[in-house]
Structure formats: C-alpha cells, structure tokens
Curated annotation (Swiss-Prot):
Main location: membrane
Annotated organism of origin: Neisseria meningitidis serogroup C / serotype 2a (strain ATCC 700532 / DSM 15464 / FAM18)
GO cellular component annotations of the record: plasma membrane
Stored SUPFAM superfamilies: HydB/Nqo4-like
Protein name: NADH-quinone oxidoreductase subunit D
Pfam families, per the entry: Complex1_49kDa
Superkingdom field: Bacteria
PANTHER family associated with the record: NADH DEHYDROGENASE [UBIQUINONE] IRON-SULFUR PROTEIN 2, MITOCHONDRIAL (PTHR11993:SF10), NADH-UBIQUINONE OXIDOREDUCTASE 49 KDA SUBUNIT (PTHR11993)
Length: 418
C-alpha cells in the first residue's frame, strides 16, 4: 500500500512572543517546510475609523497615536495634513520644521524598536538592550514637549501644541542611581532642548556603529536573514508594498522625495535602497535610514535656533488663542469655548493625504460634509499590505524563518487591525 503524505497544520500565535502583537497564523507544513501561511487579522480591531466619525476633528486626533503605537507622531502628522488641506489652513514655517524634526525622531524610535526586536526574536538578545538605551532619550524628548512618553497628541491641525521648551527636565536622585550615574545622565540636559538634540545627534551615529558591530557581519544573523523572504521589485509593487519593504527590493520610492510635504523639499538627505529584496537588505536600509534621519534632525535644529516665530496658526476658527489672551479678551474666550465644545467646521470636500511613515506609506482619506466631524475617515496602514505578502514570502522556508519574516515586515497590529 502506498504511503499517503499529509501536511501538518499548526497555529502560530496569537500569544506567540515573536508575533509582534496579536498575530494569528495558520501554518501548513510539510515536515518543517512551510507550504502555506494564512494570517488571521482583526483581533485588535477597535473601530478607530468609525469612532473618529463620532468625534470632532480635534477629539479624533489622539486616536491616531494609538494606531501604530511605535510611530506616534507620524500618524498625527498624516491626519493633521489631511485636515489642513481640507480646511485650507496655513501652517507657520517654524511649526513645519518642528514637525519634520519630530517625525524623524519618531523614525529613529521605530527603527530602533524594529531592529532590536527583530534581532531578539531571532535569538540575538544584546541588540535590543543597546536600542532601548537610545530610545529612552528620545522618549524624554516626547515627554518634554507633550507631557506623554508615547501618546503625545503634539501635532495639531494648524501647527503644534506648543513651542520647544527652553530646558530639558533632569533626572532626580533616587535609591537606584548614585551621584556618579546621575551626573552622567544629566550631563547633556544642562542647556535647551535643541542643545540636548544636538548632543544626541553627535553621539548617536557611534551607537549605530555599535549596533552594526553586533549584527551586520555576524555570521548567525546573516544565515538567518540573507536570502530569506525575498520579494522582487515587480511583486513588491503589485502587492502594494511601501517604505523599507519596497526600497529593500530596489525601488527608489519615498514620499518625502517624490511628493514632498512640510519642509522636506528643503532638506538634504539620501534614500537608501536595497538590491536583493531579502531580510538582510531591509535591515541595512533601516540602519542607513537612521543615519539619514540624524542628518535631517541636525538641519532642522540649525534652522530652529535662528528662526523664532509662531508654532500654530493664528486663525482662531481652527486653533485656540494663547492662554494669556484668553484671560483678558472676551472674543478669545469665546473662540476657545467654541473650539473645545463644538469643534472646528471643515469645508465640504475630500482628500487623501499620505506621509512617509517609518513602516511605509501611511495615508488618511477624509470626506467632509461641512460639519464639525468627519463624514468618513479611512486609514491606509502600510502594515496591512505587508502582512498580505506573508504567504508568498514564507512559502518554501523553514518554520523558524517565519519569525525573521515577521520581524522584517515590522508589523504593529494597532494599525493593521485599526
């Protein structure tokens, strides 16, 4: 009697530590080789798009932070640009520079998390410890401007919530830190926020070199990433891949260069592009992107030092007046009250606005019927398209390679499931 071969089906996730959230996949295996990978989405569905349609334009803003909760401010940026486009709001140039600077800070935050956790999933534990050391300082920047380390709600339609602070908060003594450690931690916090940013930009490239020393020529890292999850340029475009997933395959497409927004057309930076379209090339792209982000942050910091000015529109139909004015002027108080109760009214129309998110093209499509709430809000999340490529990328690889492919896609389920 002829032996019958039967494939083996297993559940991967949704509680798997390498699933980057609540990813559940049905994997069909032949021995240890993957025949089919079927991702199941929707476990983190919170109805963000529908919720935003029940809130005013300003109240809907914090929902954006909670989509991709590793790249918070870039989500806000896409939403604010869409509202500004519909309402015809002119954003002060200083606010645009601050936004671009914090968008690049967010890109570094995202890539440090992506590379660190990718290496950790594969088995290299040290990288994530180095990555989180640098992330801590960038989180302090978030906290200094907005009061929150993650969900900042710092970008607002018309500009940003407040100007950059004149000083950086310092660490205080505690039973966990002796005087020597405390002095080291507060060394770069003596001046303004821009001084802190400049000091970070000076030492961070060396920290990227340290990460590269751990991974780039590491034999085990290369064995686990070279030739894994290969996507051709044609298939990457057909699948709707964007960001590093597209550039890693050799397609030079970056919204910051091809369709510049804010002040990116005034910035001098390069777009790293891969050759082989595998996990290793995408890793190299992310490493180089962090270096390019440092270049952009330096240019923004240089400009912001010598160009003071307003950081939010003076049109009080869309942005609140200053607190000092509100306490003395009746009209200002009325504007403030109307904005935070009824909200802004955005003219009828529709717009699709996209930004170069650390994970790819993040787009916001808004239809306005002239009311104080969006009639329809659609979010184009880059991770959603990337996850749909899982079956094609994993087919023919070993079970252990699925973890490497999830890491290289850099998926966060807040934005995939929405």
């Amino acid at each position: 009697m002829a032996n019958k071969l039967r494939n083996y089906t297993i559940n991967f996730g949704p509680q798997h530590p390498a699933a980057h959230g609540v990813l559940r996949m049905i994997l069909e295996l032949e021995g240890e080789t993957i025949v089919r990978a079927d991702p199941h989405i929707g476990l983190l569905h919170r109805g963000t798009e529908k919720l935003a349609e029940t809130k005013t334009y300003l109240q809907a803003l914090p929902y954006m932070d909670r989509l991709d909760y590793v790249s918070m401010m870039v989500n806000e940026q896409a939403y604010c640009l869409a509202v500004e486009k519909l309402a015809g709001i002119d954003v002060p140039i200083r606010a645009q520079y601050i936004r671009v600077m914090f968008a690049e800070v967010t890109r570094i935050l995202n890539h440090l998390m992506g590379i660190g956790s990718h290496a950790f999933d594969i088995g290299a534990m040290t990288a994530i410890l180095y990555a989180f050391r640098d992330r801590e300082e960038l989180m302090d920047l978030y906290e200094a401007v907005s009061g929150a380390r993650m969900h900042a709600a710092y970008f607002r339609p018309g500009g940003v919530y407040r100007d950059l602070p004149d000083f950086m908060p310092k660490y205080e003594s505690s039973k966990f830190r002796n005087a020597k450690v405390l002095k080291q931690l507060n060394e770069s916090r003596e001046g303004t926020m821009l001084d802190f940013i400049d000091a970070f930009c000076e030492r961070f490239p060396k920290n990227i070199d340290t990460l590269e020393t751990l991974l780039t020529d590491n034999r085990i890292w290369k064995q686990r990433t070279v030739g894994i999850g290969v996507v051709s340029p044609e298939r990457a475009m057909q699948k709707g891949f964007t960001g590093v997933m597209l550039r890693g395959s050799g397609v030079e497409w970056d919204v910051r260069k091809t369709q510049p927004y804010e002040v990116y057309d005034k910035m001098d930076f390069d777009i790293p592009v891969g050759v082989n379209g595998d996990c290793y090339d995408r890793y190299l792209c992310r490493m180089e992107e962090m270096r390019q982000s440092v270049r952009i942050i330096k240019q923004c910091s240089e400009w912001l030092r010598v160009n003071p000015g307003p950081v939010i529109t003076t049109n009080h139909k869309f942005a609140p007046p200053k607190r000092t004015e509100m306490k003395t002027g009746m009209e200002d108080l009325i504007h403030h009250f109307k904005l935070f109760t009824e909200g802004m009214h955005v003219p009828e129309g529709e717009t699709y606005t996209a930004v170069e998110h650390p994970k790819g093209e993040f787009g916001v499509y808004i239809i306005s019927d002239g009311a104080n709430k969006p009639y329809r809000l659609k979010i184009r999340a880059p991770g959603f398209a990337h996850l749909q490529g899982m079956d094609e990328m994993a087919k023919g690889h070993m079970l252990a390679d699925v973890v490497a492919i999830i890491g290289t896609q850099d998926i966060v389920f807040g934005e995939v499931d929405r």
